[in-house]
C-alpha cells in the first residue's frame, strides 16, 4: 500500500481477523494503516469514509471458508453479490477488484456460478472482466476473476 495507502479487512469471524493480525506481527509489519473489521463484506461502504468512495485503488475478495476453522461458515451469493456491487462503486476509475472463487466445497459452486453471472452481466462500458482458470485441473478447482473499472471517459 505504500506510506499513503490504507487497508480495510473484513470478516465475520474474529479468528480470521486474529490470524491476519498475527501474520502482520510475524512479518514485522505495522498495523498503523490497517483496519480489521468484524462485519460482513456486504457492509463495507458503512465502514469506509465517504470521502474515499470512488477513490479505492483495489479490492480483493477471497471467498469460501476459513481454512482450519468451521467449514460450515462460508460466504454465499446472498452477501457476496451486494458486496461486489459495493466494491465496484468504491473503486476509482481503472481500479482493480480480484475475486478468488472456490467451487470445490459445498455451496462454493453455487456462489461461483452467481458471481460469474454477475461479472458477465457487467456492461463493457463500466468494466473489463478477466477469468484466470487452470484448464488442466478439475472443474471445481479455485479460480480468479479480475475486474478493472472503466476510466470515466471510456464510458459510453
Predicted features by range, described:
Residues 47, 105-156:
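Class I S-adenosyl-L-methionine
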Residues 6-11:
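Conserved SAM-binding motif I beta-strand of class I
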Residues 83, 90-101:
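Conserved beta-strand signature within the Rossmann-like core of class I S-adenosyl-L-methionine
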Residues 5, 29-35, 125-127:
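A short helix-to-beta-strand connector/capping loop
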Residues 57-82:
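Mobile active-site "lid"/loop adjacent to the S-adenosyl-L-methionine
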Residues 18-54:
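S-adenosyl-L-methionine
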